[in-house]
Amino acid sequence: LASKQNYYAAYADVLMQLHQREPANAHDAAALQASERARARSLLDILAEARADIRQGVDPTLLDRERTMQQQLNAKADRLTQLLSGQPTEDQTITAKKELDRLLIQYREIQSQIRTSSPKYAALTQPGPLSLKEIQQQVLDEDSVLLEYALGEQRGFLWLVTPASIKSFELPKRAEVEATARRFYELVTAHRAVKFETKHERQARLAKATAEYSEAARALSDMLLGPVAAELQKKRLLIVADGALQYVPFAALPKPGIRDQGSGISTLRIADCGSRIEESPIPNPQSPIGCPLIVDHEIVNLPSASVLAALRRELAGRKPAAKTVVVLADPVFSQNDERINRRGAEQSAIRHPPSAIERSAEESGIEREGPGFPRLAYTRREAETIMALVPEGKGMKALDFQASRARATSPDLGQYRLIHFATHAILNNQHPALSGIVLSLVDERGQPQDGFLRLHDLYNLNLSADLVVLSACQTALGKEIKGEGLVGLTRGFMYAGAARVVASLWKVNDEATAELMRRFYQGMLRDGRRPAAALRAAQVSMWKEKRWSAPFYWAGFVLQGEWR
C-alpha cells in the first residue's frame, strides 16, 4: 500500500480502517489530514523531476533525514496494514499505532526544522495541512461543501466536509473507479477529430458514443456523488480529486440519485433543473443528459484544501495589479508559417531531430502533421474578442512572434490581473516535468528559438494575477491515469502568484473555445461576476444552445483555486 508516492496515503487508509472499528474516535478527521499531506508530498515529487530550484537554503542533512524517516514510515504503515487485515487483538492494534505515531512525531520535528531554515521551501512542500476544524473555519462557508477523494489499490475514500460536520464514505478500489472514469472521459470527448476518419465513420462513432453516454455518466455520478447526494442541495462544490478523477469534468455529470438506505439501490429523485443564474431555466432536450451538475452548483477544483488556505494567506493584503489583461495568442510554431520572412526561413531550414517538447506533445496526444505544432486558427479571434472588452491602455495583446517565451517570463506580466494563454498547453502525465506551454518556436527570420515555458520556469515567475487561463490544454490518458500534469502546471502558477487557474481537460474545438471565452470574459469584465461564477454562467449558456449542448464543447474548462 505504501507506494512511491508517500507514506501519508498509506496512513490515511490505516486511519479509515480504524474509523470503521472506532467511529467515535475521529480517525476520519485524522485520515483527511493525512490525505492533505499526501497531496503536498506528491507535488514535491513532480517538482524534483522538473528540477525546480526550490531547495535553496535547506540543510542537505535535514533533507537526508527527511527521506530516511519517510522510508521508515512506509515500512511501519505496511506492517500495520497487514496487521489490520487479519484479526488483531486490541493490544496489538494499540501498540502498532503508538509506534507509527512515534515515528510521525519525529518526522514532523524534522519538517519543523526545514520550515525554520527555508520558509519558501516549506510553504510549497508543506502547505501547513489543516486540521478538520481549520478547514471548516478557513476554507468553507455556509454555501460551500468540500468533497475530497482518495483512491487506493484496495479501496478509495470520500470525505464530505461542511462548516459543522464531516462524513466519510468508502469507494470502490482504484482500478474500478478509474475504469468508470476512463469510459466517461472517452465518451465525453468523442467529438474530437480523429485523424484519417471518414465522415461516415465519424457519424457512426458519434452515434455509438451518444447512445452509451447517459449510462456511463449516470454510473460515474452514482459512484462519486451518490453517497452524498442528499447533502449537496445547491451548494458550491469544492472538489479535491485524485488520480484519474482530476480529468473528470464534474460539471457534466448528471445530478446524482438519492441513495436508498434500505436496498442500496440508487434512484433519481425527480427534481426541477433549477439554477440561480436564471429564474425559470428549462432542461435542454438536446443534451445527452437531463440536468448536468453545473446547472445547480458552482464547481471549484482544488489541489488540496490546505493549498487554498495557504493561497489566501499569500494574497492577503496584496496590492491589485494595475492593468487588466494580457493575452498571448496564435504563436508561430513552424518555419513553414506564412508569417515568416521567406528568405530568412530558407536559409535556416535545417532538419532537427525531435525535441523534448515534441516528444512531450506526442505523449500528451497532440495530433501533429509532420514536425512542429498545428496552428490554432481561432486563438486570434479569441484574443481579439477579449481585448474588445478591455479599456484602452489597460490591456496588452501579444500575437504571432510576440507570443514568445521571453514575453511570458518578462517582469511585465506582473502588471496584469488576468493572464490568458491561447496556445497549446501540454499536460504530460507520463513525465509531469515536461508539462508546459508552447509559445513561438521560431523568430521573424525563421530561426528556431526556445518557445517552451516549462514547469520549473513557472516557479521563477512573479505574478500578481487574479486569474491565469490556459485555453488549449491537451493530455493523453495513459495506462496509469494520473493528474500530475494538471496539478504541476496549476500549482506552479499559484506558487508564482496566481489566485486561480482556468484550464481545459482536453483540447476543445477551436471555435467553441473562442465562444466560451467570449461569454466567460463578458461575465467578468462587463457583468462584474467572480471568475468561478462567470465560468459557470458561460457553461450553462452553452449547454442550453443546440449547437454547443454536448459537454465536449463546454465541460472541459475547470477552475482551480480561489472562488471568492
Which ranges hold each PLM region?
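Amphipathic alpha-helical protein-protein interaction segments
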Residues: 1-260, 284, 288-296, 301, ...
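Residue-level detector of buried hydrophobic side-chain packing
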Residues: 38, 147, 158, 237-239, ...
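Functional beta-strand-loop-alpha-helix junction segments that form "active/interaction loops"
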Residues: 123-134, 205-223, 369-435, 439-461, ...
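Extracellular/periplasmic catalytic domains that process cell-envelope and extracellular macromolecules
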Residues: 138-141, 150-152, 231-233, 317-322, ...
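Loop/turn elements at helix/coil->beta-strand transitions in domains of secreted/extracellular proteins
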Residues: 233-236, 322-323, 393, 414-418, ...
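Cysteine protease catalytic core and zymogen-processing segment of caspase-like enzymes
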Residues: 253-257, 290-296, 300-309, 342-347, ...
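An often Trp-containing, charged/polar helix-loop segment at the C-terminal end
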Residues: 273, 314-319, 324, 511-564
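Short acidic/histidine-rich active-site segments
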Residues: 479, 499-511
